[in-house]
Amino acid sequence: MKIYLVGGAVRDALLGLPVKDRDWVVVGSTPQEMLDAGYQQIGRDFPVFLHPQTHEEYALARTERKSGSGYTGFTCYAAPDVTLEDDLKRRDLTINALAQDDNGEIIDPYNGLGDLQNRLLRHVSPAFGEDPLRVLRVARFAARYAHLGFRIADETLALMREMTHAGELEHLTPERVWKETESALTTRNPQVFFQVLRDCGALRVLFPEIDALFGVPAPAKWHPEIDTGIHTLMTLSMAAMLSPQVDVRFATLCHDLGKGLTPPELWPRHHGHGPAGVKLVEQLCQRLRVPNEIRDLARLVAEFHDLIHTFPMLNPKTIVKLFDSIDAWRKPQRVEQLALTSEADVRGRTGFESADYPQGRWLREAWEVAQSVPTKAVVEAGFKGVEIREELTRRRIAAVASWKEQRCPKPE
């Protein structure tokens, strides 16, 4: 029996990145031998075991053979005669097909070290094309390591295109697509994930609402980048700089979906695109089974981001109504989330990357003023039933009006 550290732990250590999880491959052993040594078996379809002390995963070396469609249609073979090289060959990328023995020596049968040095994401073997989930995984790795200068090898991107055009991605379940997307949204450069999907044709298959934005022009005065698809990825990049929250990043990604519905004869104007985009947000989220809280914020951002841009022109009643509409009294975090997504929208434009966004400050200040109006004082004043709500709203409007007169510039 020989044990090797494999995969991401080896890769990230070589890149000088923190190692989070360690996975091990056991060569020359059997399930019974592992059980006799005190390991606990957890794998149903293939033999994976938990170490009795560290609880890290130890898998018997195995090979996989395509036996059906999609990413689950594989037959696994695990036996003492499966070599380390056999096991590493079934992995997706060469940089993930590295192993380290107990002396610290790196085993690299597929030139993963060279690809690490050259910052290349390259598939190990043609078997890559048998698993459609790998298209999303490579896009996610491209996003995760973009800041280190990694790019996808030409032949790997070509294979990803072939897989997409062959209809392989249609076998992916919504849950897996969302899981990979959610993970990509946590990276430093989530926009790279969607750009890679577009480059291989997968964006049109998995995110047609976003793909439809490419080629749709916006007024050059407000959008020097012109293309709405490019603007969308720029805003996502900006959102990633402003917030680590997946819901903020996803909502920013979806903020302009309504522009994809504008008839070409009305281009480059997109009047009413915000409310129009709400149905597309709902459609996308329902298809991918996006969690409700993330979906709800994306709907609100699509509907109200343009309203927040015009904040100085809003009257106090409209401002308080906005807080009602986003359910800010019960979910106050949404005020900050809308401020961040709206700022990402403004700064996600060519030449505006460092622009100030005072509307965000005014929105936050107005919220502090409105929510500081005490409900208790209204009750103590003798108001009852629906009168409490009505009087509370009236006092909030008055408080915002007083603040706006002093703090918010009047529209020209």
From Swiss-Prot:
Transmembrane segments: none annotated. It comes from the Bacteria. This is Multifunctional CCA protein. A single active site specifically recognizes both ATP and CTP and is responsible for their addition. Residues 228-329 form the HD domain. HAMAP family: CCA_bact_type1 (MF_01261), CCA_bact_type2 (MF_01262). Keywords: ATP-binding, Hydrolase, Magnesium, Metal-binding, Multifunctional enzyme, Nickel, Nucleotide-binding, Nucleotidyltransferase, RNA repair, RNA-binding, Transferase, tRNA processing. Catalyzes the addition and repair of the essential 3'-terminal CCA sequence in tRNAs without using a nucleic acid template. Adds these three nucleotides in the order of C, C, and A to the tRNA nucleotide-73, using CTP and ATP as substrates and producing inorganic pyrophosphate. tRNA 3'-terminal CCA addition is required both for tRNA processing and repair. Also involved in tRNA surveillance by mediating tandem CCA addition to generate a CCACCA at the 3' terminus of unstable tRNAs. While stable tRNAs receive only 3'-terminal CCA, unstable tRNAs are marked with CCACCA and rapidly degraded. InterPro entries: CCA_bact, HD/PDEase_dom, HD_domain, NT_sf, PolA_pol_head_dom, PolyA_RNA-bd, tRNA_CCA-adding_enzyme. The gene is cca.
